[in-house]
């Protein structure tokens, strides 16, 4: 597939521009591509849906997913200033789909695979419980200026809800997307894949772990250890050097 997105390691429009990325799927983590579900060559879906995630709008056009056609070309115009009149939902949902898949493929290399309780519809015979791809809800209308990730035990679909904050669309803030996906990882790994409720107490490390994932996947070659790295600068509108959610 081809996806016009803010690609890894670009954290948000504050730090880079969109690029049309060709075939970014990893052959080890997603052996039949991002739009497969049956484990055979050829895509089952030509929308932003596949084995690892289904990205769709959950605002005023609930359930809508953009269409990439037979060539799986998801190349849509964007207005980075969100408004009800111009939501740029095709571009936003495409970015959300890309990042959910990229995160899946990266962490797969580090051991968050089927047997460890990762998020896939079809586990391709590699253990664990399937039927639990991520439902990634773009421009979700149930909240603002935030995001969340609900993670049941292995075999249950996680739900990622990405919100709008005024004129800023959280679906373009890749650091926030990664942070939320990180909650899914830590919820599945702490206590075991079937016991996803072990991080509900106040004294737990889930928020810090999720921030780490966001920092790791958006690090640039010139970054240095002492550098301040704020989280969520696009969503909150604080600017690239603003304090934002955390620094």
List the model feature ranges, each with a label.
Residues 1-247:
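Extracellular zinc-dependent metalloprotease catalytic-domain scaffold
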């Amino acid at each position: 597939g081809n996806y016009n997105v803010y690609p890894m390691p670009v954290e948000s429009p504050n730090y880079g521009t969109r690029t049309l990325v060709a075939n970014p799927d990893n052959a080890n983590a997603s052996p039949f591509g991002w739009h497969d579900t049956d484990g055979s060559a050829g895509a089952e879906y030509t929308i932003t849906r596949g084995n690892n995630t289904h990205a769709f709008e959950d605002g005023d056009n609930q359930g809508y997913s953009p269409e990439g056609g037979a060539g799986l070309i998801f190349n849509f115009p964007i207005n980075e200033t969100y408004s009800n009149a111009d939501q740029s939902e095709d571009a936003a949902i495409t970015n959300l789909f890309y990042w959910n898949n990229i995160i899946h493929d990266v962490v797969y290399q580090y051991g968050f695979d089927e047997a460890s309780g990762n998020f896939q519809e079809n586990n391709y015979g590699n253990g664990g419980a399937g039927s639990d791809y991520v439902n990634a809800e773009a421009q979700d209308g149930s909240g603002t200026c935030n995001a969340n990730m609900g993670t049941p035990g292995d075999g249950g679909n996680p739900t990622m809800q990405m919100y709008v904050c005024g004129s800023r669309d959280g679906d373009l803030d890749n650091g926030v997307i990664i942070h939320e996906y990180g909650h899914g990882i830590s919820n599945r790994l702490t206590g075991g894949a079937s016991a996803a409720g072990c991080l509900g107490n106040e004294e737990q490390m889930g928020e810090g772990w999720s921030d780490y994932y966001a920092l790791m996947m958006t690090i640039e070659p010139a970054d240095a250890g002492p550098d301040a790295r704020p989280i969520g600068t696009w969503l909150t509108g604080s600017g690239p050097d603003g304090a934002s959610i955390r620094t």
